[in-house]
From Swiss-Prot:
A molecular-function term among this protein's GO annotations: antiporter activity
Family: Belongs to the drug/metabolite transporter (DMT) superfamily. Small multidrug resistance (SMR) (TC 2.A.7.1) family. MdtJ subfamily.
Organism field: Salmonella agona (strain SL483)
Encoding gene per record: mdtJ
UniProt keyword terms in alphabetical order: Cell inner membrane, Cell membrane, Membrane, Transmembrane, Transmembrane helix, Transport
Record NCBIfam families: PRK10452.1
Any Gene Ontology biological process: glycine betaine transport
The name this protein goes by in its record: Spermidine export protein MdtJ
GO cellular component, one term: plasma membrane
């Protein structure tokens, strides 16, 4: 469970970092760029710890997919970016992919011990 929390933190900091990049690009201050640098750095640190126990493909797909989903939603809400029918279809496909990836994730089973063999 701890590693899933780390993955959630990686996703949240990625979203914050990417949104602050946009905020800095439309504003006049450097605070947005500094916030972006800190958040993206933290995101990769959290992700690197999360993949110790979560399969890399699953962690990366969830990190990137959920990040794209929320970045798009917040971009529409905060920066008045357009949300076309094609973007909505893409986001729905993305959500379906995230669900499929997560549902296909299983905990590894316990290793099976080999029977003792006599050596000759």
């Amino acid at each position: 469970m701890f590693y899933w929390i780390l993955l959630a933190l990686a996703i949240a900091t990625e979203i914050t970092g990417t949104l602050s990049m946009k905020w800095a690009s439309v504003g006049n201050g450097n605070a947005g760029f500094i916030l972006m640098l800190v958040m993206i750095t933290l995101s990769y640190i959290f992700l690197s710890f999360a993949v110790k126990k979560i399969a890399l493909g699953v962690a990366y797909a969830l990190w990137e997919g959920i990040g794209i989903l929320f970045i798009t939603i917040f971009s529409v809400l905060l920066f008045d970016e357009a949300l076309s029918t094609m973007k909505i279809a893409g986001l729905l496909t993305l959500v379906a992919g995230i669900v499929l990836i997560k549902s296909g994730t299983r905990k590894p089973g316990k290793p099976v011990k080999e029977a003792a063999r006599a050596t000759i």
